[in-house]
Regions:
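N-terminal export signals
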Residues: 1-9
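Generic N-terminal amphipathic, Lys/Arg-enriched alpha-helix
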Residues: 26-36, 45-55, 328-334
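Conserved C-terminal alpha-helix-loop-beta "cap" of PLP-dependent enzymes
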Residues: 18, 309-387, 391
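Conserved PLP-enzyme active-site core in the AAT-like
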Residues: 11-41, 66-84, 88-287, 296, ...
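Non-catalytic C-terminal accessory modules of carbohydrate-active enzymes
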Residues: 299-300
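Glycine-rich phosphate/diphosphate-binding loops and the adjacent beta-loop-alpha structural elements
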Residues: 286-293, 370, 375
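N-terminal glycine-/serine-/threonine-rich phosphate-binding loop
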Residues: 56, 60-65
Length: 394
């Protein structure tokens, strides 16, 4: 009887998907590279490279990180780089580098920076965003400057004082003249001999924007999920002195410090595996060699499909942005007029998520519209999303 139950259970496992085996409901990701949905789907060639790495034996991890870091730095035109467990880890480690420099005793104290001469980072108040917390994980204190609608170079310079270790900068690629630009922040950092730490998580396209941003900071963080690497990966790059400090405070530096009898740094939780490391360099090589005009044409065809089918429905207005793509997202916006349809964007989102399979989209324009990131959608999924929206508004 026990054997029969085991066989039956095995058959049920075989007949169901891997997520369903554990009671998890898979759905369609129409948001893009969002952390809440798992971030990315590495292309087959990236998966193959990762599988080969995991099945080809073991390596000395420091050597793996340094040699792959050489490839990353060479590709981006920077002095040094290494793979991290996401962009947030790179931001945190980069901040730790700005705080400790090459002082191994300070590395052993972080995140307790109360005894440090410098433990503050200036940060434009108008750049307030979800991930500014990552700059404080290593013990830095953010000093917010300027206003919600802008900040001048003079205001930033006036905020730089004896406790200032650096400038925390969120690079979205879209800051206007009312803000201190990344170039102006670089000039101030040089003038006052402080560090520029840049969160450039999604600034991976155009390619010249990718390399330019990588080269401007003392430490720059990128999210590797945006180039087709696993969700849990990132890149820390920039000036050798500070990237090396970040490296020594990473998980591998923690292990090395113990072997050398030094104070252990704080970065032990930021671990990567060898498959992830190879996934990043394989994805980076693919990203810099692929035909991006073809990639964008494919994504444009997906956006056009939404416009072609849905824009003729009364009360539905589809907007396909015409500005050149900056960053990872290729989005189409769909507005729903409650006066005509009897429902708005929030209700459409709710019904899409409650369907089978659930479809996850982004709210836009205070809920009156939805945003659909097409870069993670297959052609079949595009048709499914269009069909479901049509059914909801009909």
């Amino acid at each position: 009887m026990a054997h029969a139950l085991t066989a039956q259970s095995h058959m049920e496992v075989v007949l169901s998907g891997i997520y369903e085996q554990f009671g998890v409901t898979p759905g369609i990701n129409a948001r893009g590279n969002q952390t809440l949905l798992g971030g990315s789907t590495p292309p087959p060639e990236i998966q193959d490279a990762m599988d080969e790495a995991m099945n080809s034996g073991y390596v000395v991890f420091e050597e793996l990180l340094r040699k792959t870091g050489d490839f990353i730095a060479g590709t981006l035109g920077t002095e040094q780089a290494f793979v991290t467990s996401g962009a947030a880890a790179a931001i945190s480690l980069g901040t730790a580098a700005a705080l400790a420099g090459n002082d191994r005793e300070k590395m052993g104290l972080i995140p307790d920076t109360s005894s440090f001469d410098r433990n503050e980072l200036v940060f434009q108040k108008g750049q307030d965003y979800t991930y500014k917390r990552c700059f404080t994980l290593a013990g830095a204190k953010l000093v917010e400057i300027g206003r919600k609608d802008g900040c001048t170079v003079e205001e930033m310079e006036a905020a730089i004082g004896p406790k200032t270790a650096g400038i925390a900068f969120y690079e979205s690629g879209a800051w206007g003249d009312e803000w201190v630009t990344i170039e102006e922040a670089r000039a101030l950092a040089d003038k006052h001999d402080i560090r520029l730490i840049v969160d450039a998580a999604g600034q991976i396209y155009p390619l010249d924007q990718f390399t330019k941003t990588a080269q401007i900071g003392d430490v720059v963080a990128f999210g590797a999920k945006y180039i087709g690497s696993p969700h849990s990966t990132g890149i820390c790059t920039g000036k050798a002195e500070y990237v090396e400090s970040a490296f020594l405070q990473n998980f591998i530096g923690y292990e090395m410090a113990g072997q050398e009898g030094l104070a252990r740094p704080y970065g032990r939780p930021y671990k990567t595996d060898r498959g992830e490391v190879i996934g990043v360099v394989a994805a980076l090589r693919r990203w810099f060699s692929m035909d991006h005009e073809r990639r964008l044409a494919i994504e444009e065809a997906k956006r056009t499909a939404f416009y072609r089918v849905l824009n003729d429905i009364s009360g539905v207005d589809v907007v396909v942005p015409t500005t050149p793509q900056l960053g990872p997202n290729t989005t189409v916006f769909i507005h729903f007029d409650p006066a005509v349809l009897g429902l708005g964007g929030h209700e459409v989102i709710k019904r899409l998520e409650e369907g089978d399979p659930p479809i996850w989209t982004r709210t836009h324009d205070d809920g009156g519209s939805i945003g659909i990131g097409v870069q993670m959608l297959s052609d079949e999924q595009v048709e499914t999303v269009i069909q479901r929206i049509t059914e909801i508004v009909s």
